[in-house]
Amino acid sequence: VVPHVVTSAHGDRQDEYYWLRDDDAKAKRPEIMAYLRAENAYADAMLAHTGALQDTLVREMRARIKEDDSSVPVYDNGFWYSTRFDLGAEYPVHLRQRGSVEGPDAAAPLEVMLDEPALAKDKPFYDLGGWAVSPDNQWLAWTEDTVGRRINTLRIKNLVTGEVLPTEIPGVLERIVWAADSATLFYIRQDPQTLQSGPVYRHVRGTAPAQDVLVYDEPDKTLFTTVGRTASREYIAIWLTGFTTTELRVVPAQAPQQAPRVALARRADVRSYADHLAGRWIIRTNDDARNFRLMQATDAALADPARWTELVAYRQDATLEDFALFNQALVLQERVEANAQLRVLPWNGQGGFTVQADETAFVMSLGANLDPALPRARYGYDSMVTPHTVYDVDLATGARSVRKTQPVLGYDRSLYDSARLWAPSRDGKRIPVSIMWRKDAFKRDGTAPLYLLGYGAYGYAYDPYLNANALSLLDRGFAFAIAHVRGGSELGEGWYDDGKLEHKQNTFNDFVDATRYLKAERWAGKVFASGGSAGGLLMGAIANQAGMEYAGISLWVPFVDVVTTMLDETIPLTANEWTQWGDPREKAAYERMIAYSPYDNIERKPYPPMLVHSGLWDSQVQYFEPAKYVARLRARKTDANPLLMHMDLESGHGGKSGRFERLRDKAREFAFFLDLAGIAN
């Protein structure tokens, strides 16, 4: 304990564990490393009796993975692209094969573009950020992170000769895009301190990075900058995106030297997203349409919203989440009553249809539809009991074809069941809850253990999916559920708005209310809660506000020191997220945030058993947030329940990068919960 005062215009706070913070991106002070290693050793000792169970769980989870697996090929500009996992490999190989929109050319060789296992060799962490192939199909640019801090390096490869150019550009974001000349590459440099988006640059292949030209530098650091291309391939798109506003600037792909022009100007509280094809812009906007509507405009009219015409009207009962443009049709992704579904609208106005679903609770999501000449749209389908399935739907007939159902080895769907429940909230709302169980192992008698996930932030819809790892819990009598709490967008933009800023407490109340409903309706006797990042904030809040409702809580890379972080603009994400949580420089926002910030509300009272997971190189939620949280909680709580922290010293926000390596962390959590539930195997 070292006294330290965190100052603000609205009051000072003691932070006796502030000494655990070290902003050095390459190494931490010896006393901090000693502390973190001691925490890891303590957690290992406390869980040593579950070692055999953890090993069993890892074997079970790995046995469900088809080790020699391939993705469904995706078409773009004369090639079909895919990934392949070889037996035992942690990382995939990226492949391509020549072909047409009808399919790959069987006579053409399968080319290796990127060999991730080779790139990751001898590295404790490897993450392929993004990649882009030049329009002439000869050059590959990609970004990679070898630390886990989401600091990427840009590299370029000649796909004809296999030569990797010596040029490397460090400190860039993942997204990159080529101009039409196949020589000019647009990328975004990271702010060296916050690691967030900085200025857009263009690089000419074969020249030194020092000669790269500044294209655009956004002064408003609450906006996030990304680059892309339009479906027509006529424009390089520079997007400036915040939680409440957007702006689009474009550069002609044929004239990359031109300065970007404003195509969609930012407007307060208006979010618009546009794409271009066949001489017109299609715009998804919430202007006068809370759940979004679709507009269209010519090139000349795009900058003036008064000249737009409506293409798809606003619906109060449906949220327009996304769209994809094809030469012959427009495909919409809409959400109705928590289900995401697709609707196809031919440009000729004839034969529109909604894509068929086979279950009552499901999610469809637009896939990688990269070439508008395709006669079929690619989409994914998921539910609590259905493995991820890739479909193509014929844009003319509506006929669906299954391209691949993700193998879950040993999974027998007939043994499991699922339901969509609606839990009443304390303020009269209906909270969707997706639940799954094994029919011959689970008993709905009010005694069963239940594994409950939640998130509730950023408008992210935590959709139902088959959690293959959780089958190890279900086979031992657990139920598995997701509480779709406010702050997500499962029930539209209003559901999102009612779980942020001054309404953030609704997120926590919803999770607790869903928990109590599941107990009252005899779905659960003991509830074990888990959430990560902003979902870790949710876990920290419920631990303070209703902790003893839970038999155990697991927090993954948790955002728990809300006010201190949001006061510090040097920390990644802070300025970008003031419109999400509030700006604590303002008194009203400060008081709201301090009222729920988990670190600031730890009390001298009993807490449930808790397990905290973090990564030393996490740039999204810095390692010292969970480290301080655990230290203060251990000092103040009055019970003898276990409080454990595992700090991965070689990873960041996403945990281990290898597909098998990360199973060990999940096995630790499951063994912790199974042990608390009294289930040894």
Sequence positions of predicted segments:
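Active-site-proximal cap/loop segments of hydrolase catalytic domains
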Residues: 482-681
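Conserved beta-strand segments of alpha/beta enzyme cores
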Residues: 112, 214, 479, 642-644
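Cap/lid segment of the alpha/beta-hydrolase catalytic domain
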Residues: 113-134, 143-151, 160-165, 351, ...
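Beta-propeller folds
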Residues: 1-388, 392-397, 467, 649-650
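Residue-level signal for short, function-critical loop segments
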Residues: 287, 329, 457, 533, ...
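Secondary-structure transition/capping motifs at alpha-helix termini
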Residues: 102-105, 147-149, 159-163, 179-182, ...
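Alpha-helix capping and helix-loop boundary segments enriched in small/acidic/polar residues
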Residues: 128, 170-176, 191-195, 220-224, ...
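A structural signal for short secondary-structure junctions
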Residues: 275-276, 288, 324-326, 336-337, ...
